[in-house]
Amino acid sequence: MLLILELLVLIIGLGVALPVQTHNLTDNQGFDEESSQWISPHYYPTPQGGRLQGVWQDAYTKAKALVSQMTIVEKVNLTTGTGWQLGPCVGNTGSVPRFGIPNLCLQDGPLGVRLTDFSTGYPSGMATGATFNKDLFLQRGQALGHEFNSKGVHIALGPAVGPLGVKARGGRNFEAFGSDPYLQGIAAAATIKGLQENNVMACVKHFIGNEQDIYRQPSNSKVDPEYDPATKESISANIPDRAMHELYLWPFADSIRAGVGSVMCSYNRVNNTYSCENSYMINHLLKEELGFQGFVVSDWAAQMSGAYSAISGLDMSMPGELLGGWNTGKSYWGQNLTKAVYNETVPIERLDDMATRILAALYATNSFPTKDRLPNFSSFTTKEYGNEFFVDKTSPVVKVNHFVDPSNDFTEDTALKVAEESIVLLKNEKNTLPISPNKVRKLLLSGIAAGPDPKGYECSDQSCVDGALFEGWGSGSVGYPKYQVTPFEEISANARKNKMQFDYIRESFDLTQVSTVASDAHMSIVVVSAVSGEGYLIIDGNRGDKNNVTLWHNSDNLIKAVAENCANTVVVITSTGQVDVESFADHPNVTAIVWAGPLGDRSGTAIANILFGNANPSGHLPFTVAKSNDDYIPIVTYNPPNGEPEDNTLAEHDLLVDYRYFEEKNIEPRYAFGYGLSYNEYKVSNAKVSAAKKVDEELPQPKLYLAEYSYNKTEEINNPEDAFFPSNARRIQEFLYPYLDSNVTLKDGNYEYPDGYSTEQRTTPIQPGGGLGGNDALWEVAYKVEVDVQNLGNSTDKFVPQLYLKHPEDGKFETPVQLRGFEKVELSPGEKKTVEFELLRRDLSVWDTTRQSWIVESGTYEALIGVAVNDIKTSVLFTI
């Protein structure tokens, strides 16, 4: 019988109306002078995984042994999600029963196990970054790993290092660790290690340039009815080559060095090509230059093409369907990928690499699923029993929720400890804090953000915003936390314990009563908030990204009313990022200001502990707070007539993001990056530097690749009957299968490959590559800097000396000052310790866009050690 396999260009083809010419790299990589457009060069083929010497070799040996025995259908089943709500998790792959591989469970998110019962809502990435505590970065990762493992999750969709947080109004900034790539990289690497120590694979996201939520997706009424219907394409993040390497790619390199198993590509375009089909970003930067050995998974329906995304390096499609096509049974992959392999549009070697990378990542991270570690929850119902496949009401009714409590003393303690150490003391005049029960006998608490939301906390993806802030909204939230403690609960409990007269006024608009009560209070605490989240939820007109940096709920007027009537007013800011504080920061009656990011379930406990002195503040700002809102990089809201919005603000600011911009332009911020007061004073002195390893200008050549491998099963493509849908299987309409229908006929695929397309693998790595996270030499210690720190106060406390590096002033490359080290040390009263910072070769390097490699310039460098980027206490020079 003659069999014809149709290849639909709509489903499998390019899927994008973008230029496909090759592009020569220039000083501004990605910017084409001739067309005056940002264009991503093509890079082919996808580097085959498992060829780095000494890296993941055991994992690849095991993976290759399995894949070599698999059929095309079995391999495809690993690459494609089964469809939205067609499994217990937010993402479920197909299974390979013949080899004991069940459906893989992929579950959000960076703050905890989303959409499950009894899970802990942990402090956000932003709050975690504010601790500047490497030990807590790891412990939080371990606690997350324990809970994901206990719920039967195989792949945790976090941590987030994209967004980098370059835009103060960015909706999802709270998920990541702050507005600095070095801080983000250190925190992400530790989080990944903690997760994967607990046999849960981490998935670092969003790759790359996902700096705003507005226009992150093309218009689709099923996704967001408020989007401009003329938006034909997602926004393009236009990023120059040097900024790409020194800023946006930096924390991904740390993540890969830490052994992360998977990377999630984002919805947006990068230099006018969609992230999940951007061969330069995935094949070249991620898999070739950074030596990534795991697999790339799409954000949910961020895949915009079939064959094109496959040859561009995408390895897994989630949740399987097309954008806006939930539960339609339509996919770019699944059956269509099977077709594309059989008619040789997608080389079978590429499919082999996808499947091998997925299995190797499972082995390398010890997250390979077992029969006793399967999901014990449903993401889509809170009931104990429900349909096996939520969307298919004809599927069997089974026990879907086992109500497993994944928390223990370690996870509870870690959540509170991170929350406490993340809180930043911004102002503390007249020793207002900690609160002294002897001085404060009458205490007033006010503000909507102090108490519970009238709607409770089980709103869709934490979209209840008329109460205390625990998380931002969206898929990065936990959803159904076990409990949440408000500031009202804990502040009132401490007031009772200290026998204070206490009152709480929630009203924030009619200020008559609060003004009257404040005039009689010895101290007034005002808790305020500003919230953001993911763009699929629109709250008070905010489409994920904030419309402004103003406090919510009339809070500026509330603070003014209280402060004008109480000479001892404490403002507690709870927010997902920077807020405008100019209306009250210098008010003489506002004697203390505290900032807290989304602190998770124990938010109220942590805030009260800091205010009442049960814990000392030791957090530092992971971003810059400006005096003028004009100093923030704006959110792009302009949609051009062609319906293809572009974000050129990233290119315009280039390397000058957050504190780099303020320092370079000599702009005084309200609160600088790294700023944070303490209840003690410290002395920083006696900086010394020593060379650990000779550093040449250029990187050494990396080790050669191991030999390319093949499974020698190309004859499979001659037997499409092997892929027919099993005649005895029950077929669910919405489910995404890898099988072919038996009534199709076979003809040659007619696919227009991009110019420069090739299937020939490299035999040698490029100079900046060859190792996990890049050339191994980048990760060698080049210099060590020591400094003495001493606690001059009266209580044991934690102190964070920070090292900023200043490059040679006469160098070829203009390089802004940048964070290159921090340590958190505990010191008892009078105690002195020597703190050591290690400067890696990469910390000294700049990206040479001409040589397309990292180089170390000769000249005099200065290591600046201080307590904030603009508060340097001592420094030391060294010459290379």
Curated annotation (Swiss-Prot):
The keyword Glycoprotein appears for this protein: yes
Biological processes, Gene Ontology terms: cellulose catabolic process
Keyword terms: Carbohydrate metabolism, Cellulose degradation, Glycoprotein, Glycosidase, Hydrolase, Polysaccharide degradation, Signal
Sugar attachment sites: 24, 77, 271, 336, 343, 376, 548, 589, 712, 743, 794
Signal sequence annotation: 1-17
Annotated pathway: Glycan metabolism; cellulose degradation
Enzyme class: hydrolase
Active site location: 299
Keyword Iron: no
EC number(s) reported in the record: 3.2.1.21
Domain of life: Eukaryota
Pfam families with a match to the protein in the record: Fn3-like (PF14310), Glyco_hydro_3 (PF00933), Glyco_hydro_3_C (PF01915)
Disulfide bridges in this chain: none
A GO molecular-function descriptor: beta-glucosidase activity
Reaction(s) catalysed by this chain's protein: Hydrolysis of terminal, non-reducing beta-D-glucosyl residues with release of beta-D-glucose
Listed InterPro entries: Cellulose_deg_GH3, Fn3-like, Glyco_hydro_3_AS, Glyco_hydro_3_C, Glyco_hydro_3_C_sf, Glyco_hydro_3_N, Glyco_hydro_3_N_sf, Glycoside_hydrolase_SF
Family membership noted in the UniProt record: Belongs to the glycosyl hydrolase 3 family.
The name this protein goes by in its record: Beta-glucosidase 2
Classification of source organism: Eukaryota, Fungi, Dikarya, Ascomycota, Saccharomycotina
Gene for this chain: BGL2
